[in-house]
Amino acid sequence: MEIFVQQVVSGLATGGIYAALALALVMIYQATDVVNFAQGEMAMFATYLCWTMLNAGVPYWGAFVGTLVLAFLGGVIVERVVIRPVEGAPILSIVIVTLGLLVIFNSVAGWIWSYVQKPFPSPFPSTPVKAGNIFFGSHDIGQIFVTLIVLACIWMFFKFTPLGLAMRAAAHNPVSSRLV
């Protein structure tokens, strides 16, 4: 029974990451009507940027903030230079562009960092958390808490901020939201 509970917690941690990525895909699609097939590769590229900063001696939270800034700027550049020019194009054109971005990000990351997996340091301690006779990886517990915190922040953003409410209105009824 202990192993089953450990595996459930580990599965929840991994599933939380997949759920967050799926939520990001849905949010982008609702806002732009574009399915970004390169989203995973863009996240991988940002992770490698963080890994590079950590290996250069930047503290963990400094690398985290630096990665967020660089990923945001990179996303803005990709949206303005690559996605926006094909915004009104047929859907197949947009799919081809995002698939092209996928290949480009993957190839550039492989060229810079090679195609060998790299170990990424965890911000959580390596010692397991013990609850009775059951041991949980602190990384799994940390992933679950971080995912819940991020989801709560996203929920509050869309529920209580003017920008979040406007984005919900635009996603629900684009024509009516343009009139307001």
What are these regions (language model features)?
Residues M1-T32, F37-A170, R178:
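Small-residue-rich transmembrane alpha-helical segments that form helix-helix packing/gating elements
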